[in-house]
Amino acid sequence: MIIGIGSDFSDARRIARSIERFGDRFLDRVFTPGERRKADQRKLRAETYAKRFAAKEACSKALGTGLSHGVFWRDMEVVNLPSGQPTLMLTGGAARRLAALVPDGYEPHIHLSLTDEGPLTAAYVIISAVPKTGV
C-alpha cells in the first residue's frame, strides 16, 4: 500500500550560490557526512547536491510533514543500494514519523527516482508499506 508520495525540483545554480554564500554552514545543515563525501568526489558537485536536496524535500512531503514537526534535513540521507539504485535512509524525526505511518505487521519501503537536465534536478519519492515476511 502507498503511504506517501512526494516530488520536488531543484536548480543546481541556486545550490551553487548557497554553497558560495554560506559554505560549510549550509552544507553541514542540509547534508550528511556521507552525502558530502560523495558530492565532493563528483565533477558536477552542485548538481549532485541539488539532486540530494530535491530528494530530501520530496521525502519530507511523502512523510506528510515537510521540514517541520521534528523532521530535519540531516534525518534523511540519500544512499545507494548495492545495485546502485538510490534510496533514502531515515534517522531521527524522519524515522519516527515513518514508523508512525506504517501499520502494524508491515514494513516501509522507500522508492526514490532522481533525474536531471542541465542545472535542473527532480526527485520523486514513494513510500509504501508491505507485509512483513514471516508474520
Curated annotation (Swiss-Prot):
Known cofactor(s): Mg(2+)
Alphabetical list of InterPro entries matching this protein: 4-PPantetheinyl_Trfase_dom, 4-PPantetheinyl_Trfase_dom_sf, ACPS, Ppantetheine-prot_Trfase_dom
Subcellular location: Cytoplasm
Enzyme Commission numbers on file: 2.7.8.7
Transmembrane helix among keywords: no
GO cellular component, one term: cytoplasm
Keyword Metal-binding set for record: yes
Binding site for Mg(2+): 8, 57
Example GO biological process: fatty acid biosynthetic process
Pfam families referenced in this protein's UniProt entry, alphabetically: ACPS
Keywords linked to the UniProt accession: Cytoplasm, Fatty acid biosynthesis, Fatty acid metabolism, Lipid biosynthesis, Lipid metabolism, Magnesium, Metal-binding, Transferase
Catalytic activity line of the entry: apo-[ACP] + CoA = holo-[ACP] + adenosine 3',5'-bisphosphate + H(+)
Enzyme class: transferase
Annotated GO MF terms: holo-[acyl-carrier-protein] synthase activity; magnesium ion binding
Signal peptide region: none
Functional description taken from the UniProt entry: Transfers the 4'-phosphopantetheine moiety from coenzyme A to a Ser of acyl-carrier-protein.
Family of this protein: Belongs to the P-Pant transferase superfamily. AcpS family.
NCBIfam families (UniProt xref): acpS, pantethn_trn
Protein's name in the database: Holo-[acyl-carrier-protein] synthase
Organism of origin: Xanthobacter autotrophicus (strain ATCC BAA-1158 / Py2)
